[in-house]
Regions:
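Core RecA-like ATPase module of SF1/SF2 helicases and allied nucleic-acid translocases
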Residues: 1-225
Length: 227
């Protein structure tokens, strides 16, 4: 696995790796690896899990109007989200057909926007006009809706340091770009990423840290009189 600092870098690495694997910029296909980015209780898949794509089916779209902040004022826009029918193993390893939110899969962002989340909810309400909100039937239908509960995932060939926590791999490639400083956050990130390798570690843009990295020479200052 490749570990890097930003979602933008991870997305770029994933795109390049898939081009090398498949000979071009191809859509999601069978045997691709996904990294779950949000708990999906319907399938028992947790944030940070890696799952293989067992099969890929048809693509579909769902739309809804929302009021979004544009240029400092609210405007009514229509948001369209793209979905792919896929089969992945559930928490017990059994194949489960479900929907995957394609917009997030190749996005530089960590998650979908508030407006996109709102569009998912409004779209559900539009598809179920007979259900009243704040009822058990509404909650049950929402819990089992394939679009509202679509898998939110990224390609799992390259991940951020945040997402790699708790995982270990035999071979790990770490790109320290964006985390080469000596501040506490950078050092913690570097430690976490570096220690994910069980056997072999490959590095890029490694921070230059020596025993004197934090050594500083201060200007001579006048001391108070010593009695």
């Amino acid at each position: 696995v490749i570990i890097c600092f930003s979602n933008k870098s991870a997305n770029r690495y994933n795109r390049d790796i898939r081009k090398a694997l498949y000979g071009g910029d191809v859509p999601l296909r069978e045997n691709d690896i996904l990294l779950i980015t949000q708990n999906n209780y319907r399938l028992g898949l947790m944030n940070g899990e890696f799952v293989p794509v067992l099969s890929v089916g048809a693509r579909t779209q769902q739309s809804a109007p929302v009021y979004a902040q544009i240029g400092g004022k609210k405007e009514r826009i229509v948001i369209t989200l793209n979905f792919i029918q896929v089969t992945v193993p559930d928490s017990n390893g059994n194949p489960k057909p479900c929907m995957l939110l394609e917009d997030l899969l190749t996005s530089d962002k960590a998650t979908i926007s508030i407006d996109e989340n709102r569009a998912l909810y409004i779209n559900f309400c539009m598809r179920h006009p007979d259900l009243k909100q704040d009822t058990e039937a509404f909650a049950e239908a929402l819990l089992n809706d394939v679009y509202y509960n679509a898998i939110r995932a990224k390609y799992g060939y390259a991940v951020t340091g945040h997402k790699c926590q708790g995982g270990e791999w035999g071979k790990v490639f770490v790109d320290y770009t964006g985390r080469t400083g000596l501040d506490d956050d950078s050092l913690r990130w570097a430690y976490t990423a570096t220690t994910r390798a069980q056997k072999t570690l490959y590095v890029s843009n490694l921070p230059h840290i020596t025993p004197f990295s934090k050594f500083r020479i201060e200007p001579i200052q006048k001391c108070k009189n010593i009695p």
